[in-house]
Amino acid sequence: MDKIFLIDGHAQIFRMYYAFMRRPMVNSKGEDTSILFGFTKMILELINTEHPTHLAVTFDPPAKTFRHTAYPLYKANRSAAPELVKAALEPLQDILKAFYITVIMMPGFEAEDVIGSMATQWKGNNTHI
């Protein structure tokens, strides 16, 4: 049986941002590496404890999605993402690719929409998602 893990990368980035907010990890250059450390640690723990056969991390695209077209006020009251969150996206994707973990970002679709579609496609195919 396949053991598939689909992770919402943006949700985890925010989780790490808030987890380390009071005690950030900073490298020798003074750069905050908390998000990268926390996310990488979470992925390694997942791999070592769950032993997935498939693993993918999805991210929200930088442009608006179909939800904004359908409902123009979608996320209208949400404040902009913190700079640390924005700055973590590219290096985090590089780290994941270095681990040969599939990174998915589909224009027009948020990470959770991609996860929902993929889970629906795999449902019942001798998989544990």
Language model features by range: what are they?
Residues 2-129:
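Noncatalytic, basic helical substrate-engagement surface that gates or grips nucleic-acid strands
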